[in-house]
Structure formats: C-alpha cells, structure tokens
Curated annotation (Swiss-Prot):
The keyword Hydrolase does not apply. Gene3D superfamilies: P-loop containing nucleotide triphosphate hydrolases. Keywords: ATP-binding, Kinase, Nucleotide biosynthesis, Nucleotide-binding, Transferase. Its EC number is 2.7.4.9. It is an enzyme of class 2 (transferase). PANTHER family: THYMIDYLATE KINASE, UMP-CMP KINASE 2, MITOCHONDRIAL. It holds the Pfam family Thymidylate_kin. CDD domains: TMPK (cd01672). It comes from Archaeoglobus fulgidus (strain ATCC 49558 / DSM 4304 / JCM 9628 / NBRC 100126 / VC-16). This is Probable thymidylate kinase. The gene is tmk.
Length: 196
C-alpha cells in the first residue's frame, strides 16, 4: 500500500505523514515513512541549491532522485509488505514544475515510468498566505517559497488531482485536519478490505 501526502510548503505534510503512519501501525500495518527529495546526490543538490535551477534542470534532478528512491526504498518496502507513506511524491513534481511552464501530462508520464502510482493521495490544500506564515515560523524560506509562485503551484495541484486524490482543507486547526485525515484513511482501508 502506497499513500502519498501532498501540498504546498507549509501545508503540514510531515506532521500528517507521521500521523497516518501512527494510524496504520494501530491497525497492525508495518509502516515506512519516506520523504522526497531523498538523500541521493540529486536530492541533495535540489535541497542545497540557493537559487532556483531552470525548470528542466529541476525536473531532471527530481526524476533522477525519484528513480533511485523508487528502486532502493519504495519498491523494496512495498515488496516486503510495508505500507509506505510518502511525505511528498511525484504530484509535487507535477505541480511545482508545471507552475514553471512544463507540461503537466509530460511530467506525470515521466514519473509513472519510473515510480509506482500511489493507492491514495491526500492533498493538503491551504491558502498560500497561511502556508507561508507557517513556513516563516519554522525559519528560513527556500527559493521555492514565494507567494505568487505558491499560488500557481496550489492551482496546479488542484487541477492535476487524479482518481487517487482526496483533497483535505489544511487551513483548519491541526486536530480538525487530523480528524478529517483519519476518516479518509479509515474509508480507504474499508474500501481496500472489501475489494479483496
């Protein structure tokens, strides 16, 4: 089982990914939480660059990093019976790079050639103004965190949501967001159980 947690910077992905892992463990699943970009040399280059790279360079680095992550972490965990929760996955790639002009369908196709499709994607949707305020409280803003750009990214996330995606309003207080996510996970697990 592969669950992706997506959203713009400051949406609460890391907190909610950890919460989903707790919920799944309570239900008896072995769980791994993985974060992207990963720790490959390509992921490190994305994280360490002070300035934005060109959209094409960014896409290439994300794809190379994800290919390694899929081969070395995601697929082996799934094959060993783990439920994998992704703190960011390729929908981030689709949203962030299509907001800079690359065709969203092309990005999706390139990603789906190298990485497994999630069974469920939880899109934490939040107004960019709220998200940026949360990020500011954490410390330094990255080059990815500019208001106009995040508005475009949010729009791209919503426009490119697919049949695996459930949109959750992440502007609410954390306990309310968690409660909504818990309902989504329970409904997903029930559907999964009934389809087996």
């Amino acid at each position: 089982m592969l669950i992706a947690v997506e959203g713009i910077d400051g949406a609460g992905k890391t907190t909610i990914a950890a919460y989903i892992a707790e919920l799944l463990k309570e239900k008896g699943y072995k769980v791994k939480v993985l974060k992207e970009p990963g720790d490959s040399k390509f992921g490190k280059k994305i994280k360490s660059s002070e300035e934005r790279l060109s959209p094409e360079e960014e896409l290439e680095l994300f794809l190379k990093d994800r290919e390694i992550d899929a081969r070395e972490n995601i697929l082996p965990a799934l094959q060993s019976g783990y439920a994998v929760v992704m703190d960011r996955y390729y929908f981030s790639n689709i949203a962030y790079q299509s907001a800079r002009g690359i065709d969203a369908r092309l990005i999706r196709e390139m990603n789906e050639k190298i990485a497994p499709k999630p069974d469920l994607t939880i899109l934490l949707d939040v107004e960019p103004e709220i998200a940026l305020e949360r990020v500011r409280k954490r410390g330094k803003l990255s080059p990815f965190e500019k208001l106009d750009y995040l508005r475009k990214v949010r729009k791209c996330f919503l426009e490119n949501a697919d049949e695996t995606t459930v949109v959750v309003d992440a502007s609410k207080p954390l306990e309310e967001v968690k409660e909504e996510v818990r309902k989504v996970i329970e409904s997903f697990l029930n559907l999964k159980k009934n389809s087996n």
